């Protein structure tokens, strides 16, 4: 009996060692490149593509870290979670300074900077008006609000009612406005994931969160093939690329009026609202892509420039040295306009190859003749 127990113990030890070895071999197993992580977050999707050589264990650890970065942003900036830091800020007493996390202060500061530079074309307090037009979480039918309803909601917005103290890392609301960071939080999450991958020593990757992109290194290390991104034709239906551009060590965010809208009596109402009027935009500028080292900045600027339209948008791009590409409706075709910073960054050869028009004084004159 004693010999039987000893044999059983030995068998158990052998079995346990076998399990441990199997676990080790699985973690050490090299994966085919590229490795992709995909899923849903912030009401949209994410796709992270890694080209560096990885084992299964390394990939598992990276995926866990990526999810933690995105969860941190959601915890800080979601307006759909009762436990988020932003919801607590919106519920805090008026005129009282609230200590906030570094990342929430950073995103509030970016938002304020773009709001001031665009003279209010970007405003994180527009949430109540977005809801009124049926594009927010508030359950409303898709209909045009009355003048009285719009006036009432417009009285509740204005970034001047949010003070941000970047020295003491605090902010406060001076009026009962509702701060909504959905126009920049996604870009901030893209930056966070990229920074995490940099920290972990990953050299070749593409981060895509809801269409906000950051590329590093190559998509094919051996051939040194750069990442290439498509700038969509700004129309509903199956996505189609108007231009394909190599993206190296840069991020891009695109804003457009063509995906999210509703129609009433044949008239289309875009989800992109002008915070200065409270109404959907009505001009021929269909999309703006902003290329910037930070996707949060690109996200905010893309929205602001799309709101103001072609001529004002290009003027802002020139004043702020922004690297942007616009797609403008001209009848049945699309006119592609590039800012001076875009031309300087990507070069004349690409401009000529893609048939993109550099913005000049004559471009402005033509725009005035054809109208927005």
Show which residues each predicted segment covers.
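Mature catalytic core of soluble alpha/beta enzymes
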Residues: 2-7, 12, 21-372
């Amino acid at each position: 009996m004693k010999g039987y127990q000893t044999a059983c113990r030995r068998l158990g030890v052998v079995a346990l060692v076998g399990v441990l070895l199997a676990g080790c071999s699985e973690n050490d197993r090299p994966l085919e490149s590229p490795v992709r992580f995909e899923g849903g977050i912030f009401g949209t999707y994410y796709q992270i593509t890694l080209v560096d050589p990885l084992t299964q264990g390394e990939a598992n650890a990276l995926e866990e870290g990526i999810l933690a970065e995105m969860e941190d942003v959601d915890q800080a900036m979601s307006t759909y979670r009762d436990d988020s830091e932003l919801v607590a800020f919106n519920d805090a007493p008026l005129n009282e300074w609230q200590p906030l996390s570094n990342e929430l202060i950073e995103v509030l500061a970016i938002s304020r900077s773009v709001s001031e530079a665009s003279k209010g074309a970007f405003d994180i307090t527009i949430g109540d008006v977005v809801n009124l037009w049926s594009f927010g979480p508030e359950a409303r039918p898709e209909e045009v609000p009355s003048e009285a309803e719009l006036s009432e909601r417009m009285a509740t917005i204005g970034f001047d009612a949010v003070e941000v103290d970047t020295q003491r890392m605090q902010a406060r609301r001076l009026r009962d406005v509702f701060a909504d960071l959905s126009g920049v939080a996604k870009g901030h999450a893209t930056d966070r994931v990229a920074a995490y991958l940099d920290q972990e020593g990953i050299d070749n990757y593409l981060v895509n969160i809801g269409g906000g992109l950051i590329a590093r290194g190559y998509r094919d290390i051996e051939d040194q093939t750069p990442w290439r991104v498509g700038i969509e034709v700004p129309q509903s239906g199956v996505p189609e690329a108007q231009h394909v551009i190599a993206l190296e060590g840069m991020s891009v965010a695109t804003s457009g009026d063509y995906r999210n809208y509703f129609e009433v009596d044949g008239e289309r109402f875009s989800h992109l609202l002008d915070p200065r009027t409270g109404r959907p935009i009505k001009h021929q500028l269909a999309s703006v892509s902003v290329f910037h080292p930070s996707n949060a900045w690109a996200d905010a600027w893309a929205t602001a420039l799309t709101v103001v339209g072609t001529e004002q948008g290009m003027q802002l791009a020139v004043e702020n040295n922004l690297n942007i590409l616009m797609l403008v409706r001209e009848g049945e075709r699309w006119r592609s306009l590039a800012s001076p910073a875009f031309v300087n960054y990507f070069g004349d050869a690409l401009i000529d190859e893609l048939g993109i028009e550099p913005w000049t004084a004559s471009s402005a004159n033509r725009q005035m003749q054809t109208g927005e």
